[in-house]
Design a protein with these regions (language model features):
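Long, intrinsically disordered, low-complexity Ser/Thr/Pro-rich regulatory/activation regions
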Residues: 2, 46-72
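A short, surface-exposed helix-loop junction/capping segment
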Residues: 1-8
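Short histidine-centered catalytic/ligand-binding loop motif
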Residues: 9-12, 53-54
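A short, structured beta-strand/loop element
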Residues: 26-48, 54
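General N-terminal targeting signals
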Residues: 24, 28, 35, 59, ...
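Polyanion-binding surface elements
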Residues: 11-30
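Extended aliphatic helical segments
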Residues: 15-18, 41-43, 62
Length: 72
């Protein structure tokens, strides 16, 4: 298992404790980030998803990101 796969697995297994850095790393694996004011927008395929830039990331934001990735 590569480092990338391990990092993604760690995020998926513990959605309660995900840092902003890990959250944005996961976005960049599947899409890109549009920076804004207090919120940024993750763009994965044809789906846009706004999220607050705070550390650690809230559990609902992480779950929704994983759902978007799995359904792409």
């Amino acid at each position: 298992m590569s480092k990338k796969e391990k990092r993604e697995q760690k995020i998926r297994e513990n959605v309660k404790n995900v840092s902003l850095e890990d959250f944005e790393w996961l976005i960049n694996q599947y899409g890109y980030i549009k920076m804004g004011g207090s919120h940024s927008v993750a763009v994965i395929k044809n789906t846009s998803y706004a999220y607050p830039r705070k550390n650690p990331m809230g559990q609902p934001y992480v779950k929704r990101l994983i759902e978007i990735i799995d359904n792409r």
